[in-house]
A protein has these predicted regions:
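Helix-loop-helix hairpin linking two adjacent transmembrane segments in secondary transporters
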Residues: 169, 207-252
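Juxtamembrane intracellular "pre-TM" segments in multi-pass secondary transporters
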Residues: 69-74, 255-287
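Conserved MFS/SLC helix-loop-helix module at the cytosolic interface between two early adjacent transmembrane helices
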Residues: 129-165
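Cytoplasmic helix-loop-helix junction between adjacent transmembrane helices
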Residues: 173-211
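C-terminal membrane-cytosol helix-exit motif in multi-pass small-molecule transporters
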Residues: 241-260, 450-454
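C-terminal transmembrane helical hairpin of 12-TM major facilitator-type secondary transporters
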Residues: 347-390
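Helix-breaking motifs and short loop linkers at transmembrane-helix boundaries and internal kinks
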Residues: 110, 142, 163-169, 366-367
Length: 465
């Protein structure tokens, strides 16, 4: 065994006895100081390091580790991504569980497709509005408290919506669901960008968005299958109960913020933050990208049920609900492409994912069901990949007021859902699926042009963003 190393400190006269190997001693010094100094000539293997480590070095190391980023492969990383996975699951399950029941609502309340789409659009509109408030609130109060409160409130409002018989009351509860969910949607991306090591942010964001995809799929799938056997009221209660379970898991396992620093809620400060983001060369384009991508995605899933329930397909509500399994492609693509973007760069990846969306949607314009379903799958794969890349780009691009930047991105994202989702109903009534097709293709071409514009964007100093 190697002999213990000892050396008398030049500064304090104390003797530090090192009982570890020389390698351990060197690693300790590196941890304390970040790197080896090249300014002091090294005359021996021990002397320079003994001079650099003061008696309080251990305290400094502990303080530094306390503020460190969460690294991939650590238990903290697994807890974080699992918690945000559950949060994303609950958010999208609560938000999009109403899509399969839109045809049933049209029949029960004697309303057309555009009016029925309000049950989703009112939620996403209130969510978009809430994003402008909850993001800055989290900058002051902290990330985790806002997200936990948001999930529990949204789950309870969903349960309440299943107990109300009138259309206006249902819309009111759905508005409360959207407003509540803004607390998680606005903050989750910011939490990840603050706590996860920058080298792994793409993977972490991809896993969070995978939770979104599973939530959206599960909400649609459970609702679509259940309403063939029970009332949509009962199905809504089941969705709300599952969301309560997910909210509890989220609350228990999400680590507290370690790198959060509270900032002012002064209106002038908030306005300065918004102005700063819109003056950035890239962020406004990312906000527009979110609007176009989400508008196209929600429009397809809002009205595909109307097409497949009618002639010549005449599919049952349960079978249409099962088509939500195409979300599995999004679960894979969000994590895989997010990690790929970390390696190859977001400029190279974003536009390619939109081309995939276009290719998938073109397949849905044909009549055979065996082309429609693969088209939906490819379209979904491309959408979640694009969203993963664009959303992780926000955290890298915004140098200050990251919560506000995330809020503006998601405001645009859900504004696209509300506006395009309802506007699609008019195209459906004007031209059927071909009318929907022209609308979605226009949105995707716009998204592709924005992505190509972003590909030419000059990166920030010392960042690939």
């Amino acid at each position: 065994m190697p002999s213990p190393l000892s050396r008398r400190s030049y500064q304090t006269g104390r003797t530090i006895y090192w009982k570890e190997s020389l390698a351990s001693y060197i690693l300790f010094c590196i941890a304390a100081h970040g790197s080896l100094s090249t300014e002091v000539p090294v005359k021996s293997a021990v002397a320079p390091f003994a001079q650099q480590v003061p008696p309080t070095a251990l305290d400094e190391v502990v303080a530094e580790l306390t503020d460190a980023f969460i690294e991939k492969g650590t238990p903290m990383f697994m807890r974080t991504v699992l918690a945000l996975f559950c949060g994303g699951f609950a958010t999208f399950a609560l938000l999009y569980c109403v899509q399969p029941m839109m045809p049933a609502l049209s029949h029960e309340f004697a309303i057309n497709a555009a009016q029925s789409s309000l049950i989703l659009s009112v939620s996403t509109a209130m969510l978009a509005f809430g994003l402008l408030i909850t993001g800055p609130i989290s900058d002051r109060l902290g990330r985790k408290p806002v997200m936990v409160a948001a999930l529990f409130c949204a789950a309870l409002a969903t349960i309440a919506s299943g107990l109300i018989p009138g259309w206006e009351g249902i819309l009111l509860m759905r508005a409360l669901v959207g407003l509540s969910l803004s607390g998680l949607a606005a903050v989750a991306m910011t939490y990840l960008s603050e706590e996860i090591h920058p080298q792994h942010i793409g993977l972490a964001m991809g896993l969070y968005i995978a939770g979104n995809a599973i939530g959206g799929m599960s909400g649609r799938l459970i609702m679509g299958v259940l309403i063939d056997f029970v009332s949509w009221h009962a199905a809504t209660l089941i969705i709300g109960a599952l969301a309560l379970i997910a909210a509890t898991v989220f609350w228990k396992i999400l680590p507290e913020s370690r790198n959060f620093r509270a900032s002012s809620l002064k209106p002038r400060s908030l306005m300065n933050g918004f102005v700063m983001h819109f003056r950035d060369a890239g962020l406004p384009w990312l906000f527009l990208e979110a609007f176009l991508l989400m508008g196209a995605f929600v429009t397809l899933f809002n009205y595909i049920g109307y097409r497949l329930l009618a002639d010549p397909y005449d599919l049952s509500q349960a079978v249409v609900g099962l088509l939500s399994l195409v979300y599995l492609s999004g679960i894979y693509s969000s994590a895989k492409i997010g990690s790929l973007a970390d390696r190859l760069g977001r400029r190279r990846v974003l536009w390619a994912t939109i081309v995939l969306m276009l290719a998938g949607f073109v397949l849905t314009l044909f009549s055979p069901l065996w082309l429609i379903v693969p088209g939906m799958l490819i379209f979904t794969f491309g959408f979640f990949a694009a969203h993963s890349v664009a959303s992780s780009w926000i955290g890298r691009r915004a140098v200050k007021a990251k919560g506000q930047a995330s809020s503006l991105y998601l405001f645009s994202y859900y504004a696209g859902s509300s506006i395009a989702g309802t506007a699609g109903g008019f195209f459906w009534h004007l031209g059927g699926w071909n009318g929907i097709g022209g609308f979605i293709v226009a949105l995707l071409i716009g998204a592709l042009l924005v992505a190509l514009r972003l590909a030419k964007l000059a990166p920030l100093r010392n960042l690939k963003a």
